[in-house]
């Protein structure tokens, strides 16, 4: 019997944990901006600042979490502690109605948990296979697909719980999901005994001040306290500036490490792709902030006598990614003919073009709202689905190129820099863009009147901004295509 005939048993526990982690994270994310504005009565500017700071830090901490796992905790312990912290964070978030300080503390705990979890769950999965095991790619594909299942279900379940019961119930359901995933994972603990555990030698080296686990407890208590400070706007900006400077310094070091012109060109391609990815995600991340508030205020959400909770719309994007991803994988076959760089830029142009089309649909929706008071639900669904489809032509393409680079020992670092720019910096920029929609006035009774014209203007500007990016990418695509054609003609002559 072939020992590679099926996946290792341990993978199913990792997959279960991944499903519930996505459920927990995206369920809470779907509720957060609505909770800040509708329940805590934050003004839009304050809510956007906090939301973007939270989303930015989520993409910074995995770098630290990966370092901690490599040096001290090991992937398995880091994943378990991360899951536990995220569950605790969601519980504390549900209690933030009691006192505002719980809000910042809860988000900080979730960020720390996410940092420990996200960077290490993939590494833990990798430990289940030998380097040459042919099942490896299938295992990672299974984990990715499972995560999408969680992100589809989460906004529906948590949105329903919040709408029918309470905000605490919605956040509590996210916590229950994370706890369920952790319990399932612990039930399969015996399948992970061969994976790398806690580095006791490192812990013993610091035993002269505190017991082994004392240092870990200090870290778990101090880190949320430190990150809580970063949620003030100025400090979060400073943190991103420092992280970006460090990232650029690392890029310069990698460039000097390149041994030939081919490697330098590969690095230049990755840097350029990362820049356009950053702009793409600054537009796409409006889904959790300005678009969510637009849906809540200006879209007719009634369907068959039921008012669809705003949070449920967050499932449309994930569903489109999964459905279109399956279509591309099974129906569209990658051509091996032609130049790979030309194909890469063609895909980026398509992704940015679809993003522009999605926001064009949202602009039409907003204009409809201005004329008739509310926009139609199908138009909103179509716009979000097109934007979800666009994602498939950006991140997978960029990440594939990063893994192809021939400079040894830099793939992980480049992945971290890509996440920093397309995740952390993009989310900060998304907050700046979303804040342009925060125009409101008060009527004679003191009620807030939100400006639909602000949404029209911002959605329209993003439409043209994404289209301008398409133009720039097409110029690069045309240059690469002509260069490839001229090279081919020279070889034939």
Swiss-Prot record:
Record function comment: Probable proton-dependent permease that transports dipeptides.
Q: Which InterPro entries match?
A: AA/pep_transptr_DtpD, Dipep/tripep_permease, MFS_dom, MFS_trans_sf, MFS_Transporters, POT_fam, PTR2_symporter_CS
Where located? Cell inner membrane
Q: Which UniProt keywords apply?
A: Cell inner membrane, Cell membrane, Membrane, Peptide transport, Protein transport, Transmembrane, Transmembrane helix, Transport
Q: Where are the transmembrane segments?
A: 14-34, 49-69, 78-98, 101-121, 138-158, 167-187, 212-232, 235-255, 267-287, 312-332, 344-364, 379-399, 413-433, 462-482
Q: Name one GO cellular component term.
A: plasma membrane
What's the source species for this entry?
Answer: Shigella flexneri
Q: Which protein, by its recorded name, is this?
A: Dipeptide permease D
Q: Kindly list the biological process annotations in GO that this record carries.
A: protein transport
State which ranges are Periplasmic (membrane side). Answer: 35-48, 99-100, 159-166, 233-234, 288-311, 365-378, 434-461
PROSITE patterns reported for this sequence: MFS, PTR2_1, PTR2_2
Name the encoding gene, please. dtpD
